[in-house]
Amino acid sequence: MPSFRVETPQCSYSAVVERGVIAQAAKYIPPKTGKVFVVTTEDVWRHAGPALQKGLAGIDCEILHLPGGEDHKRLAPVEQLAEKMVQRGADRTSMVVAYGGGIVNDMAGFLAAIFMRGIPVLQIPTTLLAQVDAAIGGKTGVNLVSGKNLIGSFHQPLAVLTDPAILDTLPDREYRAGLYEIIKAGIIREPDLFRYLDVRRHAVIARRPEAVDHIIAESVRMKAEVVSSDEREGDLRRILNFGHTFGHALEAETAYKRFLHGEAVAWGMRAAIYLGEMTGHVSAEDSVEMLELIAEYGPIPPVNGIPAENLAARLVHDKKTVQGKVHFVLPVRIGEVTVVSGVEDKLVLEAIRAALV
């Protein structure tokens, strides 16, 4: 059973990767915990609810449903859930279990962070993207019309329980969206994982258990190491934003309705790779290899009809922009990236246009 420790100045917890771990969820509920509120969506609960019901047998639980979709990742649903928790007897001994994909992880984590100034949360991700990224590291939050995750907080979970078996029924589009995040891990820090994704592509796409378990474990290990080194994104953790600056602009420009988050990140990585080559940070050879691997795990939904100028304007509202300067994570080589600012607007626009083709 791979289990990776996340060590931050305030806390330490396990990110467990194990088939069947959801059935053991009750052992991660601390003694003297009051009522447990499982935050999920109707769709997740319909397909995966029985597994968690078994895992939490004997625990005093309430099930709360969030609306699905990135366009519902707003403050209002969080406030509504908080009201329901009060009505159902929540107090400071209560805790939240986040059971769903990345949107649920973010929103349920944010709910736990602000309810009565903070109660514990247990993260149980049910999509590949959430398992390798969103559930680990304590980032929580919701979107504004202006941009993604502009309201939020850091709130580390008690643990992260990742069960690869739950992905067996995940739709292909959702599965591929998660694979793009794993490609990101390979590009930014894990060259061996990048090579594995290339050589074992057919096994990964076919969801062979040994391949799926390997790429999840390697991605979780990497994320745990980075978060342990830099919880608050002061330095190293910024590399995890590779593809996200451009990707968030694409999501906001399309009102969070046209692309899954992983698909937007895949497009954002393409734009960042083009920009990295234009600015001389990465060789043409490595650039081609990165773009080809992303394409092999495609297709990304068409991005036609989106003005490049609109996307460029959105970059200013990215939460990583400091004093009007957009910070870009650009590739240096496979397994290494760098953070740069002050890139000419003309080059940024050219990179966006190249990625839109």
What are these regions (language model features)?
Residues M1-M95:
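ATP/NTP phosphate-donor binding region
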Residues P9-C11, S229-E231, T254, K346-V357:
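Catalytic, metal-anchored helix/loop core of enzyme active sites in primary metabolism
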Residues R195, R200-E309:
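Active-site segments that bind and position negatively charged phosphate/pyrophosphate groups
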Residues M107-G118, E253-T254, Y274:
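Alpha-helix C-terminal capping segments
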Residues I103-F110, Q131-V132, H248-A249:
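Short glycine/serine/threonine-rich phosphate/pyrophosphate-binding segments
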Residues P2, Y180-I182, H281-V357:
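C-terminal charged capping/lid subdomain of soluble metabolic enzymes
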Residues E7, V16, F110-A203:
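A glycine/threonine-rich phosphate-anchoring loop and its flanking beta-alpha core
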